[in-house]
């Protein structure tokens, strides 16, 4: 049986990750991965830029000149960030979160923000807990909104109320 991590342990682990990311971005320690000679879009200046892209803890932490534990020369190819779908109802897809991730990731969506009001209307907090657990280790980052309409209308008998 796995030992559950303490709240203090979780905070300490997350803090250490953030400090590592800062050190990599500042160039004090090597990145986990560096994409050398990449072409990327500067969305603020609307320019194509060329340089290295540093990755640490699964995050892009800097562009410029970096060294990494792993370096891959991408030969000037264009590198794009993942897409974010800012409002979905994941359960409306009628597939499990795992299958949903398999469908959207190949098309460039790496993050979704979902409003789980449908499953919350039917199952209440058990449904929301299921969604949280089912999205925990997916290759797509799933964030949740607080459902604003549970129950959907005063006339509906949905089966659940969130207090």
Feature roles, as predicted:
Residues 10-81:
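Histidine-rich, glycine-flanked metal-binding segment
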């Amino acid at each position: 049986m796995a030992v559950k991590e303490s709240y203090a342990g979780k905070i300490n682990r997350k803090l250490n990750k953030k400090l590592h990311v800062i050190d990599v971005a500042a160039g004090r320690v090597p990145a986990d991965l560096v994409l050398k000679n990449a072409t990327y879009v500067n969305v603020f200046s609307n320019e194509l830029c060329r340089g290295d892209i540093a990755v640490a803890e699964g995050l892009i932490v800097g562009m410029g000149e970096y060294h990494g534990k792993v370096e891959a020369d991408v030969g000037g190819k264009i590198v794009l960030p993942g897409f974010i779908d800012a409002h979905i109802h994941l359960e409306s897809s009628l597939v499990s979160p795992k299958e949903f991730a398999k469908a959207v990731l190949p098309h460039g969506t790496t993050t979704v923000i979902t409003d789980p009001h449908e499953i919350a209307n039917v199952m209440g907090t058990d449904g929301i807990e299921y969604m949280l657990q089912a999205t925990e280790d997916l290759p797509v980052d799933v964030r949740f909104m607080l459902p604003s309409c549970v129950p959907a209308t005063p006339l509906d008998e949905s089966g659940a109320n969130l207090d």
